[in-house]
Regions:
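N-terminal secretory signal peptides that target proteins for export/translocation
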Residues: 1-8
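Bacterial N-terminal signal peptides
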Residues: 11-21
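N-terminal periplasmic/intermembrane-space "pro-region" immediately following the signal or transit peptide
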Residues: 26-123, 235, 291, 455, ...
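Outer membrane beta-barrel
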Residues: 81-248, 255-274, 283, 320, ...
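Outer-membrane beta-barrel pore domains
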Residues: 127, 170, 195, 275-468
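A short secondary-structure junction signal
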Residues: 238-239, 249-254, 291-294, 349
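Short helix-to-loop capping/linker segments positioned immediately adjacent to catalytic or ligand/cofactor-binding
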Residues: 249-253, 267, 305-306, 324-326
Length: 468
């Protein structure tokens, strides 16, 4: 019986302890409930304050006119890419770019009497330039979207001789349908490949020899260009140009109307993710009236020759680019070539103090170049170029008919000019380029000109991507 009484005693003791703690736990529950009510009230007040502030902001937004969206800056490139069509007031402010260029040159032969043997002199864009330090050519470019329909570009060339000339000044449409675009004003012709590229974007200090011989440098048009880009995966571009034809090999005609034009086609594509290519064919037709040049006859006497007739030029161009997986920051290679052929038919005048003669003239002349540029390290490149010209078949009526000897046309004597160039450049940034170039120039009759040049280029301001 003793164990039973002991069990009752323990149960009673437990009940007494529990009853003693109930008031304490009830007090704790009340305290927790009070804290929860306080937190709920505090959060409710904060929510009401935020809702009130939100209502005020919504009222302000509803009564304030929306701000104009910030425009994208218009794209700029010496060979400009299709520009942005961003709106807003700032879109009417032109993007400004300045290219500062200069060099120092050591030339074996006198550059003042530089002439490419076998070809009619083509103007000031021929030759290696001056000896010693030369400020060279700098460029000032302004570009902008005029409105949603037109893009404008002005590029002025500032020479070291304190002269300013307009390289390009044109407007281009932005809103024509079906892949069409129309350009009007002064612009570099789209024929070939390198003709459209501004001098600061060349891979060498100077242009290929064939461009100097046949165009006197870069061929520009004062006129219009209509271009069509096909809506296909394969890049297909067709273009037609016309203008006043005043640049060599044409001249400004002494009458109203146009002077010839050009037809262009370019195609291109990618091969995998590392190789891309582009190829093209171009045709240029112009007329020349009294396209004059100075010469020396066989006795050293001064002669003024002048060509009048039709000039037609065909251009075939191709370029292949390689960059590992499309990333050209580390390594890349570019292989580029062009072939040009010019046919001219008309009359050639021969004028001296004692004679004024003229007879038929016909010439079939050509030239080509091949160059490769390899970027072997980030910002470091090496390149080599080979130039070749053929003065071809030249038929001079005054010579064929026995009126004058061939020596009377000294500059037109048969020749095969050549040049080999090598360059090495360093690009500390995308805005700076320092280039060292050495060339063996055999473009003259019998003089080899060894040319060593150090060039600098600096870009200031807006600077867009160059053409492919």
């Amino acid at each position: 019986m003793f164990p039973l009484h002991r069990s009752h005693a323990l149960r009673g003791f437990a009940i007494i302890v529990l009853l003693a703690t109930l008031p304490a736990r009830a007090s704790e529950v009340s305290e927790l409930r009070a804290q929860l009510d306080a937190l709920r009230s505090d959060y409710q007040a904060k929510i009401q304050a935020l809702e009130s502030r939100l209502a005020q902001l919504e009222t302000q937004v509803a009564t304030t006119p929306p701000a104009a969206a910030a425009p994208e800056p218009p794209a700029f490139a010496p060979a400009p890419a299709p520009p942005s069509s961003g709106g807003g007031a700032n879109a009417f402010n032109p993007a400004v770019s300045v290219i500062l260029g200069g060099r120092v040159a050591q030339l074996d032969a006198d550059p003042t009497d530089y002439r490419i043997a076998g070809f009619m002199p083509a103007g000031d864009g021929v030759g290696p330039g001056s000896r010693g330090f030369d400020l060279g050519e700098s460029e000032l470019t302004l570009t902008a979207n005029v409105d949603p329909y037109f893009f404008a570009n002005l590029t002025a060339s500032l020479s070291g001789e304190n002269t300013v000339s307009v390289e390009e000044a044109y407007v281009r449409t932005l809103a024509l349908p079906s892949g069409l675009s129309l350009k009007g004003g002064r612009f570099f012709s789209g024929l070939g490949y390198v003709n459209e590229v501004h001098s600061h974007a060349w891979d060498f200090v100077d242009q290929p020899l064939v461009y100097q011989a046949l165009f006197g440098g870069q061929l520009a048009q004062d006129g219009a260009q209509l271009k069509w880009l096909a809506p296909t995966d394969l890049f297909i571009e067709l273009a037609a140009e016309t203008g006043n034809g005043q640049r060599f090999p044409g001249t400004r005609l002494a009458r109203n109307g146009l002077n010839g034009g050009a037809l262009l086609v370019h195609v291109g594509n990618d091969i995998g993710d590392s190789v891309s290519w582009r190829a093209g064919l171009s045709w240029l037709s112009q007329r020349a009236e009294n396209r004059s040049f100075a010469d020396l006859d066989g006795t050293g006497g001064a002669v003024a020759d002048a060509f009048t007739g039709r000039s037609r030029t065909w251009v075939a161009d191709a370029i292949l680019k390689w960059a590992p997986h499309g990333n050209g920051n580390l390594r890349s290679f570019k292989l580029q070539a062009e072939y040009l052929r010019r046919n001219e038919d008309g009359q050639l005048a021969f004028v001296t103090a004692q004679q004024n003669l003229a007879d038929s003239y016909s010439a079939r002349q050509s030239g080509w170049y091949l160059q490769g540029v390899y970027q072997f390290l980030p910002r470091w490149r090496f390149g080599a170029r080979y130039d070749s010209l053929d003065s071809g078949d030249v038929a001079i009526g005054l010579v064929q008919h026995g009126v004058l000897p061939l020596t009377a046309f000294g500059v037109l004597a048969p020749a095969a000019p050549r040049r080999v160039s090598a360059m090495f450049d360093w690009n500390p940034s995308e805005f700076t380029r320092l280039r060292l170039q050495y060339a063996w120039d055999d473009a003259r009759m019998s003089v080899r000109d060894r040319q060593l040049m150090l060039q600098y280029l600096y870009a200031i301001g807006a600077h867009g991507a160059h053409k492919f």
